[in-house]
């Protein structure tokens, strides 16, 4: 079975996912890299997300989540990568992406595509949205390797 030799990119969770992963015993054997690319500039500079993608679709979108995770998987030796971008609140929501809207990207090394998912977490509490986002990302990774 594939290891989690992975990379994680988070926007709305601010590092919570890697914090949860590093609580696991033996994590150095499967955890490689974690990036918090909170700003659009860092998404562009570190992950290679195109400015046009962000300007056309927004930082919180399927397209940006996919570009983020494809950038991660191409720049690392990880077997699996996940991206999270969303609106954790309490402000920043829009009609299209209200507070609680989160997009996830997941990619497996040597596959030429990534899957994206959109989730809406109805609790408007920032901490709850972040926690639920991190847990959903863990579930995505687990499902991808089993």
PLM segments and residue spans:
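Short alpha-helical segments enriched in small residues
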Residues: 2, 6, 12-146
């Amino acid at each position: 079975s594939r290891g989690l030799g992975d990379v994680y990119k988070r926007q709305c969770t601010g590092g919570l996912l890697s914090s949860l992963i590093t609580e696991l015993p033996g994590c150095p054997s499967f955890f490689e890299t974690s990036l918090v690319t909170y700003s659009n500039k860092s998404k562009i500079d570190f992950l290679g997300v195109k400015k046009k993608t962000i300007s056309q679709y927004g930082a919180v979108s399927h397209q940006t989540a996919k570009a983020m995770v494809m950038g991660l998987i191409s720049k690392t030796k990880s077997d699996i990568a996940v991206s999270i971008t969303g609106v954790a609140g309490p402000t920043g929501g829009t009609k299209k992406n209200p507070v609680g809207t989160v997009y996830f990207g997941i990619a497996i090394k040597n596959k030429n595509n990534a899957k994206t998912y959109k989730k809406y977490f109805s609790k408007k509490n920032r901490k709850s949205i972040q926690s639920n986002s991190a847990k959903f990302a863990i579930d995505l990774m687990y499902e991808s390797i089993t």
